[in-house]
Amino acid sequence: MEIIPNLSIETWVLLATSLMLFYIYGTYSHGLFKKLGIPGPKPVPLFGTIFNYGDGMWKFDDDCYKKYGKIWGFYEGPQPFLAIMDPEIIKMVLVKECYSVFTNRRCFGPMGFMKKAITMSEDEEWKRLRTILSPTFTSGKLKEMFPLMRQYGDTLLKNLRREEAKGEPINMKDIFGAYSMDVITGTSFGVNVDSLNNPQDPFVQKAKKILKFQIFDPFLLSVVLFPFLTPIYEMLNFSIFPRQSMNFFKKFVKTMKKNRLDSNQKNRVDFLQLMMNTQNSKGQESQKALSDLEMAAQAIIFIFGGYDATSTSISFIMYELATRPNVQKKLQNEIDRALPNKAPVTYDALMEMEYLDMVVNESLRLYPIATRLDRVSKKDVEINGVFIPKGTVVTIPIYPLHRNPEYWLEPEEFNPERFSKENKGSIDPYVYLPFGNGPRNCIGMRFALISMKLAVIGVLQNFNIQPCEKTQIPLKISRQPIFQPEGPIILKLVSRD
């Protein structure tokens, strides 16, 4: 039996040439950082360094920082990434050179109409959307929207009381995932779901499908390894977002818009209505009005960017409060003083709670919403002696930045006092980036913080939080791309009544 097949010389030449071309494609960009004198892990042909993500992106970033220092290079497939943890360079990337060089985020592949979402749009289109949407997230608009958000806070408390009455420990992600979903769907689409008690609601089902991303998903992997396939996928109407969910929400926004126009509900204050108002304003320039497709894209991206991040962040806060009774008690005292006799929370009272702000900020330092901030270099540029070629993705690794002992005393410790009035002025704004910084920071930052704080106030007004036998101490972080605990955070709630 022959081990080597008996092929013609032409076939062998063709096979050898194909393998050589494949190897060249898989390695052509992998010498970039070595040429520039920038350290980093050794890439594997075709795949780059993505296999190093096995223990999680955050762990890879942390290990690289400890090994290579504040600047290193790595590769996702053929795409070069330059990681930076120098505050001066971070400031240049996020702020000073934002409009001229680092305007755009990384493209993740074929996105269909989701390219019209503010987080994924580019250059002039992004500027236009930011200009239109920024007034929607002002303090004044959020204050108007606060009664609607508080309504979902009341639903959260009803659900918590029912769960607490069972006497069983509670899965934090389940309860706060439902709360987060209700707040976002209510404020984005104007629907009341009560997703904890209606998990089969089509709205909830379609929304959760949007959030299912696996780091080694074959389709995503094909986009990472062969970026040239993206326009082909676009032509074939493929998308990284599930088509059924996209069509569902696109149709839903159109229906909701028609219903509101028919019933003349112009006074409702939610994101959908505020976006509709850009179309209805007299004298509104056509380029400043959102199309129906753009409205759908923004509403969907609110779910994509807000649901998991908010619910996971609240769960982390609850874990820290449960395992630090002194911090919990101090925060309860502040809440009780501001809202005696369990008075309903007001927007102004929430915004004035200093210790609550300190606790939330410290939790976001230890457990950042995003593991990285990415910007693509639009041209060759040199910053502080570091040459960055056109097309390089400049990434800021948030986890190691937030735990860097050079900037944070005892960085692994949960210490809200870091963010006290006396101390927070000494924090460099470019080493604490839970929502990014500069013109392209998270537009929904205020909304997310209000959402988190509203939940924390409601819980601590009515319950004491305690660890139980099922609580994982110390907490371990998942290997998934989204920063989250390895297992569910399970805690016990005890009524204060």
UniProtKB/Swiss-Prot annotation:
<protein>
    <recommendedName>
        <fullName>Cytochrome P450 3A18</fullName>
        <ecNumber>1.14.14.1</ecNumber>
    </recommendedName>
</protein>
<dbReference type="InterPro" id="IPR001128">
    <property type="entry name" value="Cyt_P450"/>
</dbReference>
<feature type="binding site" description="axial binding residue">
    <location>
        <position position="442"/>
    </location>
    <ligand>
        <name>heme</name>
    </ligand>
</feature>
<dbReference type="InterPro" id="IPR002402">
    <property type="entry name" value="Cyt_P450_E_grp-II"/>
</dbReference>
<keyword id="KW-0560">Oxidoreductase</keyword>
<dbReference type="Pfam" id="PF00067">
    <property type="entry name" value="p450"/>
</dbReference>
<keyword id="KW-0479">Metal-binding</keyword>
<comment type="similarity">
    <text>Belongs to the cytochrome P450 family.</text>
</comment>
<dbReference type="InterPro" id="IPR017972">
    <property type="entry name" value="Cyt_P450_CS"/>
</dbReference>
<dbReference type="InterPro" id="IPR036396">
    <property type="entry name" value="Cyt_P450_sf"/>
</dbReference>
<keyword id="KW-0492">Microsome</keyword>
<dbReference type="GO" id="GO:0008202">
    <property type="term" value="P:steroid metabolic process"/>
</dbReference>
<keyword id="KW-0472">Membrane</keyword>
<dbReference type="GO" id="GO:0020037">
    <property type="term" value="F:heme binding"/>
</dbReference>
<dbReference type="GO" id="GO:0005506">
    <property type="term" value="F:iron ion binding"/>
</dbReference>
<dbReference type="GO" id="GO:0070989">
    <property type="term" value="P:oxidative demethylation"/>
</dbReference>
<dbReference type="InterPro" id="IPR008072">
    <property type="entry name" value="Cyt_P450_E_CYP3A"/>
</dbReference>
<keyword id="KW-0503">Monooxygenase</keyword>
<dbReference type="InterPro" id="IPR050705">
    <property type="entry name" value="Cytochrome_P450_3A"/>
</dbReference>
<keyword id="KW-0349">Heme</keyword>
<dbReference type="GO" id="GO:0008390">
    <property type="term" value="F:testosterone 16-alpha-hydroxylase activity"/>
</dbReference>
<keyword id="KW-0408">Iron</keyword>
<dbReference type="GO" id="GO:0005789">
    <property type="term" value="C:endoplasmic reticulum membrane"/>
</dbReference>
<keyword id="KW-0256">Endoplasmic reticulum</keyword>
<comment type="function">
    <text>Catalyzes 16-beta- and 6-alpha-hydroxylations of testosterone.</text>
</comment>
<dbReference type="GO" id="GO:0050649">
    <property type="term" value="F:testosterone 6-beta-hydroxylase activity"/>
</dbReference>
